Amino acid sequence: AGQLNDLGSAIGNAVEERLKSERFKAELITNVSHDLKTPLTSIINYVDLLKKTGVEDPKALEYIEVLDRKSQRLKKLTEDLVEASKASTGALTVNKERLGFIQLLDQALGEYEEKFEKSGLSPVCTAPDHELYVEADGRHLWRVIDNLLGNCVKYAMPGTRVYLDVKAWDGNVVLSVKNVSREPLNIPADRLMERFVRGEESRTTEGSGLGLSIARSLTELQGGTFRLDIDGDLFKAVVSFPECRALTAAPPL
């Protein structure tokens, strides 16, 4: 019995130390990102001013465009770092409400229409002709969908279709997103959900390797499940949330 108690105590201490380590990393990332925010905002503002000064020199315009793109990428990276850190430690506030899942997905697809077109991708969406409701945080759920679509834009093979399927299944609303990867996926699916891990080793596309990790953490934070499947160069993400049944009218008094 004494050995079991000692073992239980050791495990408890190890878990506590791990939690402290995670909290420390979260605080460090948040503080560093905050320190970067002020100078980065100044750089972005000065770049905007340069764009409005009527510069005509082609080389100077090229430099300004590079500055703009890189500073915006750094801004997105710092935001992703903070969100990934908070989501993984459960330090984000979750305000659940009844949401129309199909409506939210339609809005996201509308915003991504131009991005899909530029990437040579054709989205094919299959969904019921009636709304499916979930109880979730609207901002976090939007980020999950946004990250999944953004992942397609970055890594799907141009000239292919992206298949999105929404259905009610076994008390859940399930979204699956399938695409063909532009690069071989020589990596286990679980590894793709880790922070800073990307499926393509050449790193020819701009990305932080945080998108899928954030999507999984935010999904689980809201009581959902997140799964990845890889078969050759076929990538599939499956997100599931408990279905929230339609409200019924109150009986007359």
Report the location of each language-model feature.
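A conserved beta-strand-to-alpha-helix junction within the catalytic ATP-binding
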Residues: 95-109
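Conserved glycine-rich
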Residues: 223-224
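Short conserved segment of the HATPase_c
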Residues: 129, 184-197
